[in-house]
């Protein structure tokens, strides 16, 4: 048997912000590592969403990595950001935070990890 690895997709689902101005971490699991992270707005939501790092401030832009534009009630193409680690599972989802202009809105967050496979 040959030992191989492949990427397996996983998802946090929608990471919603209960209180605008109070960034919410993607996860509190600081041990989790990922090879790839995808952040996308939820179609139909109406407020801007912000992705950043600990201590981010959407009002000043400090710590903000990306500002996502909403699709609105009419739908449309969802704004997204994909981060990839070319050297394996080096991205730590717990390092990323979401903030929103509208309570209850947020981002859909997916991630990929390398898993062993024996063929």
Would you name each region that the model predicts?
Residues 26, 39-45, 100:
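Asparagine-centered strand-capping/turn motif at beta-strand->loop junctions
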Residues 68-93:
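Beta-sandwich interaction modules
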